[in-house]
């Protein structure tokens, strides 16, 4: 192909070490776990499989970018705490909830191929409590009062009106963070 490679951008990594690409960590799994085949023979089916993983730093950066995460260090250990987004307080309830839903779904749709994408549930938790705090700040009340006011059938939802006068409810994302194939 006669391609020229840039020394700054090119990084050759051993397959067992994770290579970071587009927010994913790509590596070859090294595992001695066995599974029986349909003929009853033990096989190492998980060994030498290419894995896509989601690093903790990846969604930590995203949460910091959205300004919903406050990191506190106590006794050398990192604690994550959700914080409100004052810039969204001027929006109506539908716009606030819709923004949070779009951000969560966007991140999940991008990282749903990762083998450990269920770790995004921590991101969902932080985003949910950030949303509670944003609503509480907007109405100058507590998170528990906001949850009581907006929770219907166990789901956080906001009622909004359409142009023809009918009402609909927009619920907070509750689709889970399962790996997609």
Report the location of each language-model feature.
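Non-catalytic terminal/accessory segments
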Residues: 1-181
